[in-house]
Amino acid sequence: MSLPPLTLTRRLLPLGLVFLAAGLSLALVGPFLALFLSTSVDAGPVKVTVFLVVGPLAGVATSWAIGRVSDRRPMRRHLLIIASIAGVIGCGLAAVIRDYWALLALTTTAFAVAGALFPQTFAYAREVLQRDDPGRAALGISALRTVFSLAYVGGPPIAALLLSHGGFTAVFATAAVMYALATLVAFGWLSEVEAPAAPEGDQPPPVPAPAASRIRIWLTVAAFTLMQAPMVLGVQALALFIEHDLHGSVGDAGLILGLCAALEIPLMLGLGLLTRRISVRALILAGSACGVIYSAIVFGAPAVWVLLAAQIVNALYIASVSSLGITYVQDMMPAEPGRATTLFTNTFPIGQIMAGPLLGLAQHTDYRWAYAMNFVMCLLGVLLLLATRPAARVSTLRLRRARASGADVPAGDRRPA
């Protein structure tokens, strides 16, 4: 039976604090990592590039391994604690270490383990929501994703303030404190989500939702990767495109990015509410189509004001893919929330790696062509999602009755997922 809304809100409150702390940690460090390496560590362009590629790859591999283990037994709370402690260790050491190779070792160990905090917290939230209020699972995930976005709104300005007063030592030390807060919340406030209790008496066991086929899962992951890369490339190329092609200023780029971020947050919540009336798949397809439209608009934009006007389309694209994509992949793998969430969250660092060489290609041609490449990637992503139409599934009620009586399931009871 579903819990009252207030009880469920209280249940998600500690998860919201974990997301806020983890989000602030990443938002403090991430935007200034290249600056840290080039100024405080004296790393050259090649070393910076290697660091920025090896770090995400190590995070992807570690999160994947932890995601597979996490679904085998009730241990997700312990994994949240371990990942948070790894973040404390990584940021604490980075506050004082200035040797490139030592930092590279840190990013492939402690920071890679800390990266599992994001997907594992979403997986924990999924288990709680599915147990307590399945009808609001997508809304709950969207709300938590919004908290993470809020952290990224406040994180960079806080980091800039810390840099001006205490340098990178203060930045990494503050990030370590945030991870410590996440550790305390996970240790003292969260409980392990146990497996569903066995039914009593002659009641038939609940019928688990079938997982999607392996090919459909991997095609869906490929689609989301193709739609994450344009988000990164679009941001990386924006200031350069505005300055070189539209003859605007860096301030114009900041205004556009700020407007988009401000629109994303209410849109994430609104899309979460819409999932109670419209399927997650339909909303994601519509949002992905917005990515195609936005890329086309920017490619043909004659002035900065066109980009400003198009941010509502861009925000719809980012909000739908970023917030609902997690729920969509989790729905495809209902028995493996940890692995499902990790599969989705890993699409972002892979998209980051893809965006780097594409930006270099745009530098040798024209920055406008970065958005032509975004158009192609978004279009391919939409086509892949359309190609992965869910297979027919069996009516759950009729399936239970048929299993209880030992009869075959009528073909007429099969319906699209």
Locate predicted features.
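C-terminal transmembrane helical hairpin of 12-TM major facilitator-type secondary transporters
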Residues: 281-325
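Interfacial helix-cap and linker-helix signal at transmembrane-aqueous boundaries
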Residues: 37-38, 69-71, 161-165, 242-243, ...
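A late C-terminal transmembrane helix in Major Facilitator Superfamily
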Residues: 335-365
